[in-house]
Design a protein with these regions (language model features):
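Conserved beta-strand-loop-alpha-helix junction that forms the acyl-donor binding cleft
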Residues: 123-135
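A conserved beta-strand-loop-helix scaffold within acyl/acetyltransferase catalytic domains
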Residues: 37-60, 65, 73-84
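Glycine-rich phosphate/pyrophosphate-binding loop shared by adenosine-nucleotide-utilizing enzymes
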Residues: 67-72, 89
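A short, internal acetyl-CoA/4′-phosphopantetheine-binding micro-motif in the GNAT/acyltransferase core
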Residues: 90-102
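A conserved beta-turn-beta hairpin within the catalytic core of GNAT-like acetyltransferases
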Residues: 79-91, 146-148
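Conserved acyl-CoA
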Residues: 106-122
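Conserved catalytic-core motifs of GNAT/GCN5-like acyltransferases
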Residues: 126-127, 146-156
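Short amphipathic alpha-helix that is part of the acyltransferase structural core
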Residues: 1-43
């Protein structure tokens, strides 16, 4: 499933991580800098990502304008261990270069259509408390999501 906007310069596609990583690493660095005030370092586990992608678990949706990568949305598809036979998706990373208004909404809609197509029953979206994504909770609610939990991070 691909999305080509009425304006042909915007494309949304599921891409292979290995095919977009060299270009995407710059965006991931920008995302980490924007949303990680706790000192979490940029050091992706590329081999685990590739393994999960080969298993059909990890997916990356890439937004491009005139061929240039401007954003990505990633998720992991899995089974709900507490509800037999229930396929779920957990959003992992989502980043869009500043100034590309409306593209994030198109990315969300693309992902939701994909989830429906592959039989996902529940999607777990999240947002950080830092950076531009800190207001995504209201956006998710406008799209029909309900807040169900809050995550906490601690170093042992």
């Amino acid at each position: 499933m691909d999305y080509d906007d009425e304006a042909p310069e915007l494309t949304l596609r599921l891409e292979s991580f290995k095919d977009c990583w060299a270009e995407g690493a710059e965006l991931v660095r920008a995302e980490v800098k924007e949303v990680e005030p706790n000192g979490r370092q940029f050091n992706p586990d590329v081999q685990s990502i590739l393994t999960n992608e080969a298993l059909g678990i990890f997916k990356i949706l890439v937004a491009r304008k005139n061929g240039e990568m401007i954003g990505y949305l990633t998720w992991m598809i899995d089974f709900d261990l507490e509800a037999y036979g229930t396929l779920i998706a957990n959003q992992t990373a989502w980043y869009l270069k500043p100034g590309h208004y409306g593209v994030a909404d198109k990315m969300f809609d693309f992902a939701m259509a994909h989830f429906k197509q592959v039989g996902v029953k529940y999607v777990y979206w999240h947002h950080t408390f830092n950076g531009r994504g800190k207001t995504l909770g209201r956006y998710f609610q406008r799209k029909g999501a309900k807040p169900i939990s809050m995550n906490y991070m601690i170093q042992p």
